[in-house]
Structure formats: C-alpha cells, structure tokens
UniProtKB/Swiss-Prot annotation:
Pfam families: FTHFS. The gene is fhs. Pathway: One-carbon metabolism; tetrahydrofolate interconversion. It catalyses: (6S)-5,6,7,8-tetrahydrofolate + formate + ATP = (6R)-10-formyltetrahydrofolate + ADP + phosphate. This is Formate--tetrahydrofolate ligase. One of its GO terms (biological process) is tetrahydrofolate interconversion. Belongs to the formate--tetrahydrofolate ligase family.
Length: 554
C-alpha cells in the first residue's frame, strides 16, 4: 500500500472556493489561503440563525495504545461515507500540533484513504493559528516580567502561574530560570515552557463565538497573584486589546477537504488530557448549520475528550448530540489484556478476551449520557476473523451496534455500514444527560466523575489541592465546570492500571484555574504540559527534494 503522503499527492482536489460554494458560503465570508485552504469568517454564523442544526456525531475511543487507534481516520471515513449515502456531511477536527508531528506521532491528518488535505500544510504551519496563539500567550509572559521589573500591580514573582509556550516538544524547557544577567534583564525567577496546545489561549480560541466573547474570556485569564494573595488577571494588565488583535484572524475556522472532497473544518487544537480536547465551537456550529451530519472527533478515550464533550462543551453551548461512535481496535484490546506492545499484531484470542472489559467500561460509561452508541472496530491488516468475531459477539452481549471500519484501506466504501448504523441510531433523537450539574460544588462534581466514569470508590485530595480549593471558593470560582487532567492510558489516574480498574482511590494532587476558558483543571497524576521528543523522533525521517516534494511526513 502507498504511504499516506503518496496517497495524498495522488488525490484530485477541488479548488477550495468550489467547496465553499457547494456549502453556499458567500464569497465575502471567506478568504483564500492558496487554492486548497480558506478561512471562513465567524460573522457568517450570524447569517445562519434561521437554519436548523444538523445531526451531531461525536467520535471517541476506548483507552488507546501509545500509537493511537485511528479516531481521525474513522471520523474522516464516516463523514465521507455519509456523503456517499446522500447525507450532506462535514467533518470537524483539531489542528495538529507541530511538536507531536516532529516527535513520536508523525502527521495527524488521518491516514491511508481517509485523510484531510492538503496534509503537508495542515501538519506543518497551516494558516498560522497556532503561531498566533503562541504570540498572544508569550505577550502575556513578556508583560508580566516587564511589570515585575517596574513593580506594577505589586505582582508576587513567586506566584506567577503563567508559563511561556512554544509549539515544539522540548523537555529541556520544562523548568527554567529567566532574567539572569543582572538588573537590566529584570527580576530572576523560576519559569518554564508548555506546548502551545496546552495554552489556556488555545482553549479559549475553541470556546468563543465572536470577538466580544474572545475579549471577555481573555480578560478573565488569571496569570498570577499579587503580594496580598489576590488574583491578577489579563484585564489588570491592560492588554486584552493587544491579545485580541493578535488572534483576530485565528478565530476564523479553516475550511479544507477530505481525499474524496468532503468538506472539513480543521480548527484549534487543545489537548484532551489537560483541556477539553475538541475543535473550535465556531467550526462545529458553522458545520451544523451547513450540513445534515457533523462528525466531530474528541481527544483520547471516552473518559477524556468524550466526557468533556458531554459534560462541558455540549451543555455550555447547547449542543444536542445524536450519536456516539466509539472507536475500538483489536490491538488495543489485546494490549489491555496483557499482550506486549511490540507483539500486538500477533493473533492472541486469550489476550483479546482479557482486554474486552476495557471496551465494556467505555460502552457502559457512554450509555450514561443517554446518547446511542455505535462501536466502530477499526480494522488492521493483522486482525483475524476469529478475533473480529469475538469482538462482535461481545458487543452483542453489551447491547450495542458494531461495525467493522476499513476506511484506512478503502476510504468511504470501508465505512458505509458504519454510516448507515449512525443514521439509524440518530433517528432516536435522544436527549443528553450529563454526569454532573454546573451548580454542583466542586468536590461533588469530581466525586461524580470519579465514581461514574473513572470507576473509583473514593476521592482523596492532597494538602495543596485543599489549599487551592479555599482560594477558588474565596474568589468565586468554585462553580465553574471541572476538567480532569489525567493519563490517557487508563480510565484511572494511574497509567499502569490497564483494562477495567475499579474500587481504587482517585487522587487529586492540585487544581489549576482556567478562568478565561471557564473551567477548573483538577490535576490527577503527573501530566506533562511540555512533551519531550522520543529517542528516535519522527523528524529524522523527514526530507524535501529539489522539487519541493516532502517525504517522511506520515
């Protein structure tokens, strides 16, 4: 089979203005970035209020292996298949972060015959959205150190909670000292870098509906404490306007297309293990007005991106999901059954059977939201008929629809059965039921998530967490929704607890306030916001020839 980049180059793309015209987007509401990319103005959403929303399909996954299980590929193939069965469909995805592209993951625009294109541009600099977020984020950092030097706002230099950022994996920058070299360089203090996808500004970009909303959320960001222990906000720094200027174009969704010319919005990129893990709400809302079905991907497993989509994003913006697609793979289930990571392509019914409870816990958890679930078994070349039949039989016992997806090798043709089943269950018109209410006390929200989703028997808080709770309550933040930051490799807070762990203690070690984005981050376990490169990073495989053809980006 051809490589992803070879398949992408062989695709016959339509000019993006033709895709926009097919969606009935007037020319004055989009700007072209070359022949194959356009930015659609957020203002166009105001012109669509008279239209009903289409069906919203959320794609999530079981607990993944380190390599991922193909949610993006599944989302793209499903959207293309819906179009093939004459349902107008748009897929909405997050933008790839450059760090993981150069690191262990490689490209993140789908794979095989289910890709969004132009994949080289999407995986690299794209339309500059991530650069804009990086610039805005670092402006805050620069202003903070400037104000500390000149003693404005009485900022406590030991209580600065706003790190610097860059869109690259670089572990050496996790903990640094800034302002060395004498008085002229400022006041020395401990600092660090996070990857841009982990920035609160990235989360805000994906949670705003217009410029007014952007300015309000930016103003509310808490960046430090003063020497009285009071929060210092961006509004206090008087740079809301400057930040908004830097982000004015980045807030507009990016329109591209799939390998089969299905429209795709690729916009924003917050991680799901430390933020809400979904593409921009502007992209989703635009897509809902322009199509019969919107397929949206959420990050990592259903205990992370899926949970946050149903407990935070959907209630906040009044979204009404019609179906859930749960991506599973035989190799991931064998991994949860104890099979070694390097042997996952070796058939093993015993390991598969032992790993099936991981599928069970995700199905059970998703059913609690009252949205119908379809399991999409993402087929790999190494899967045997016996293994596939074992998963099908198990899904029957769980009372859930299952479809074998071959979108990677066959494009839309490999996902027709999945599309038909999604349409069928969407007709049920179910109403979302979230796990917690926004009005619940912070500790109650966390307990409901821990027991219903993470399957813990109790929750414990460190002394640091208890101290932060007092701060949150004192300054009126306790009623914000909660985003649990935890490992993606287990439904628990311990990456070593594979399968279906239960009856354990879920530990919250501290909280971080994302007042601008509108949520509290509960930290469970050790979560790195600045990844490191792997021993052999994907960057060493990349090259470009004298004709400008890129290799190794897949």
């Amino acid at each position: 089979m051809l490589s992803d980049i070879e398949i992408a180059r062989s695709a016959k793309l339509k000019k993006i203005d033709l895709i926009a015209n097919e969606l009935d987007i007037p020319e004055e509401y989009y700007n072209l970035y070359g022949k194959n990319i356009a930015k659609v103005s957020h203002k166009y959403l105001n012109e669509l209020n008279f239209k009903n929303d289409g069906n919203l399909v959320m794609v999530t996954a079981i607990t993944p292996t380190p390599a991922g299980e193909g949610k993006t590929t599944t989302s793209i193939s499903l959207s293309m298949a819906l179009n093939k069965i004459h349902k107008r469909s748009i897929v909405t995805l997050r933008e790839p972060s450059l760090g993981p592209v150069m690191g262990i993951k490689g490209g993140a625009a789908g794979g095989g015959y289910s890709q969004v294109l132009p994949m080289e541009d999407i995986n690299l600099h794209f339309t500059g959205d991530i650069h804009a977020v990086t610039s805005a984020h670092n402006l805050i950092s620069a202003i903070l150190d400037d104000y500390i030097k000149y003693n404005k706002y009485d900022i406590d230099s030991t209580q600065v909670s706003w790190p610097r950022t860059m869109d690259m994996n670089d572990r050496a920058l996790r903990e640094i000292i800034v302002a060395l070299g004498g008085k002229k360089n400022g006041y020395p203090r401990q600092d660090g870098f996070i990857i841009t996808a982990a920035s609160e500004i990235m989360a805000i970009l994906c949670l705003i509906e217009n410029l007014e909303d952007l300015k309000k959320k930016l103003s509310n960001i808490v960046v430090a404490k003063n020497k009285k222990g009071e929060p210092v906000t961006v509004k206090d720094l008087e740079i809301t306007g400057a930040l908004s200027v830097l982000l004015k174009d980045a807030i507009n969704p990016n329109l591209v297309q799939t390998i089969e010319n299905t429209p795709a919005f690729v916009h924003g990129g917050p991680f799901a293990n430390i933020a809400h893990g979904t593409n921009s709400i502007l992209a989703t809302k635009l897509a809902l007005k322009l199509s019969d079905y919107v397929v949206t991907e959420t990050g990592f497993g259903s205990d992370l991106g899926g949970e946050k989509f149903y407990d935070f994003v959907s209630p906040t913006f009044g979204l009404k999901p019609s179906a859930t697609v749960l991506v599973a793979t035989i190799r991931a289930l064998k991994y949860h059954g104890g099979q070694n990571l390097k042997d996952l392509n070796t058939p093993n019914l015993e390991s598969l059977e032992k790993g099936l409870p991981n599928l069970q816990v995700h199905v059970e958890n998703l059913k609690k939201y009252n949205i119908p679930v379809v399991v999409s078994l993402n087929k790999f070349y190494s899967d045997t008929d016996e293994e596939i039949n074992m998963v099908k039989d198990y899904c029957d016992k769980l009372g859930v629809e299952v479809s074998v997806n071959e979108g990677f090798e066959k494009g839309s043709e490999g996902a027709i059965d999945l599309a038909e089943k999604v349409v069928k269950v969407s007709e049920q018109q179910s109403e979302l039921k979230s796990i917690y209410d926004f009005k619940d006390p912070l500790e109650v929200k966390i307990e409901k998530l821990a027991k219903n989703i993470y399957r813990a028997s109790k929750v414990e808080y460190s002394s640091e967490a208890l101290s932060t709770i007092k701060f949150l309550k004192k300054y009126g933040y306790e009623n914000l929704p909660v985003i649990v930051a935890k490992t993606q490799y287990s439904i628990s807070d311990d990456p070593k607890k594979l399968g279906f762990p239960k009856d354990y203690t879920f530990t919250i070690r501290d909280f971080e306030l994302s007042a601008g984005a509108g949520f509290i981050v509960a930290l469970a376990g050790d979560i790195l916001r600045m990844p490191g490169l792997s021993k052999v990073p994907n960057a060493v495989n990349m090259d470009i020839d004298n004709e400008g053809n890129i290799s190794g980006l897949s």
